[in-house]
Amino acid sequence: MTPKEFKRLYRIISILLEQGIDELVPARYQPWPGRLARRSLFWLKNKRQGLNRGARIRLAFEALGPIFIKFGQMLSTRRDLLPPDIAEELALLQDRVPPFCGQAARRQIEASLGCTIETLFDDFDETPLASASIAQVHTARLKENGREIVIKVIRPDIEPVIEADLRLMQALARLVARFVPQSGRLRPIEVVEEYRKTILDELNLMREAANAIQLRRNFTGSEALYVPEVFTEHCREQVLVMERIYGIPVSDIAALEANGTNMKLLAERGVEVFFTQVFRDSFFHADMHPGNIFVSYEHPENPLWIGIDCGIVGTLNREDKRYLAENFLAFFNRDYRRVAELHVESGWVPPDTKVDEFEFAIRTVLEPIFEKPLSEISFGHVLLNLFNTARRFNMQVQPQLVLLQKTLLYVEGLGRQLYPQLDLWQTAKPYLENWMYQQVGPKAVWNAIKEKAPFWAEKLPELPELVYETLRQTRHQQRHFDQMFADFRRHSRRQGQARYLLGVGASLLLAGVFLLTQKQHIEWGQISLAGAGLCWLLGWLRTRSH
């Protein structure tokens, strides 16, 4: 550990002690490193005696800085791991970081692009439009056509800081996993590793550019979602250049109402966008919190969502989509047996899971929820309760489902904030049923035939030759097999004869030795020994002949 890392570790431990995090663990369960730290750093007192545990943890993350704040924000979405009071407090974390100076941003952009800003852009504003822990955004115009753009640039020298903090977080996670018996359910090492992958992905803006291009292509011409254009020729790992958009923040209800927005349709559009991404495209924006969603000023009677910051996306394969759709339909029909069977069939829980017990556990958790009217039921919380129940039956963490459940909670929360009477089930059901209709039945068969038709059209002329070649190889392999079988039988026969001769030789040897000890039978003993030698010689020759 370097002196700088040791200093940072001391700072982390100091903050945890000052926020009273160690006191949240009962004394009898406290690991010895925690007790040692508290006794060794006796001058660091708990400054948060009167606060609940959620507030203490939130304040600790805020004091630890932007990397830990982002980690806390990620944890707030993992309601399958954290108690509700802690998750709700962590959801209040805000990524408030002072901007770095415009001159540093200019140098970073020019170093990445290999030319001066004035070569490519006009009206570059050194005062950032927005600032966050990893990057900040500046406005400008493209010199070639005057289009308004935003330039997102990674903070200078942020990568070594992130990597150092991640190493310390991994070390702390290993300590917690080793010394805190109750940490097994929280899986601290897995959670930190998941965060490490997420934040390192965010450092590569080319990845975000690719995600935005894919999402924009999926919704070309859509009345539901608009994704700003990315100017790839000016994008690098540390610089992202895209179209500047103007819109109303989706969380600004007053401004939306003042603009005459159709709030019911806007809320339903959010659900439409989510389920279209999941079931049509298998590619969804997985960071749809209010800060990343705007609403177009134009056509408020037919509102258009605008999505930005595509750094985090999720994907689902065909099987995951099928199981997910069937799960939704099954538990809204209260078919808990089918829900349990689907979890086993999908491989989400071990194949030896007792379906009867699993069904009963699901029924116990979900039946009280479905006593409410469907319009009051939270899709996200149904999934959350379902995953928590499945985890008791050793369900493995499914990263794509965790992202999906987090995004669904965002969409649902936004939708009900915009229009409290939103019936998510009625809005989503047509998408689920249509997708299932596309996947099973005559139409699905016809679609599969159409999808494979070009392949078979290409291969059909080759079919006679392939059949002939297959028959020829089969005939050749049959002859080869017959020869191998004949050789095997011959070898087995020789081996049997050799074993017989060796056995007779051994018997004659024993008889000869015995007769030699009897003076009246010396001649017979000599004959037996000679016979034994002859049998062994023949047996040895037979084993050598193959």
From Swiss-Prot:
Domain of life: Bacteria
GO cellular component: plasma membrane
Membrane topology: Multi-pass membrane protein
Membrane-traversing stretches: 498-517, 522-541
Residue ranges of domain Protein kinase in the record: 123-501
Chief place of localization: membrane
Cystine pairs: none
Any Pfam family hit: ABC1
EC nos: 2.7.-.-
GO molecular function, a single term: protein kinase activity
Compartments it resides in: Cell inner membrane
Alphabetical list of NCBIfam families matching this protein: PRK04750.1 (NF003404), UbiB (TIGR01982)
Family assignment from sequence similarity: Belongs to the ABC1 family. UbiB subfamily.
Name of this protein: Probable protein kinase UbiB
Organism: Aeromonas hydrophila subsp. hydrophila (strain ATCC 7966 / DSM 30187 / BCRC 13018 / CCUG 14551 / JCM 1027 / KCTC 2358 / NCIMB 9240 / NCTC 8049)
Upper classification of the organism: Bacteria, Pseudomonadati, Pseudomonadota, Gammaproteobacteria, Aeromonadales
Gene name tied to this protein: ubiB
